[in-house]
């Protein structure tokens, strides 16, 4: 598992969350007017729990609103950004910190290997 995989699954999370929570091995979604079969890796079944843990641990209601709307409900960044009193850079900083915290939880539970962490380039 690497950070790019996590980001890709976060982009389609609203379309696959019911299948993940139902314990299915895959889901069919529509992407670019095509039906696509998405296979779920083992670590993905922890994602809903981690998201809820992060939302419960945060005190900022604006942050929880952003994550619920953009990740869980599947609204676009543009739609969510128009509804919150934040600058664009602050909005994306919140989302980046959320992704980092999710990745750290996967590391803590052993889903990310040392080689995968070292393989990710800093200067890309």
Question: For the regions a protein language model found, what residue spans apply to each?
Answer:
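N-terminal interaction/assembly modules
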Residues: 1-56, 109-124
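Short alpha-helical segments used as structural interaction elements across diverse proteins
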Residues: 14, 27, 65, 90-92
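Amphipathic alpha-helical interface surfaces
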Residues: 43, 47, 62-63, 94
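Short, amphipathic alpha-helical "recognition" segments used to contact nucleic acids or chromatin
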Residues: 62-75
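Helix-turn-helix DNA-binding module
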Residues: 73-90
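DNA major-groove recognition helices of helix-turn-helix
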Residues: 91-109
């Amino acid at each position: 598992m690497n950070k790019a995989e996590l980001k890709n699954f976060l982009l389609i999370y609203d379309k696959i969350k019911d299948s993940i929570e139902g314990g299915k091995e895959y889901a069919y979604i529509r992407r670019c007017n095509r039906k696509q079969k998405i296979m779920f890796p083992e670590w993905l079944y922890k994602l809903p729990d981690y998201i809820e843990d992060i939302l419960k641990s945060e005190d900022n209601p604006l942050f929880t609103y952003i994550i619920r709307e953009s990740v869980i409900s599947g609204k676009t960044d543009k739609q969510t950004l128009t509804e919150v009193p934040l600058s664009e850079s602050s909005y994306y900083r919140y989302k980046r910190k959320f992704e980092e915290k999710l990745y750290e939880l996967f590391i803590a539970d052993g889903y990310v290997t040392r080689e995968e962490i070292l393989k990710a380039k800093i200067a890309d």
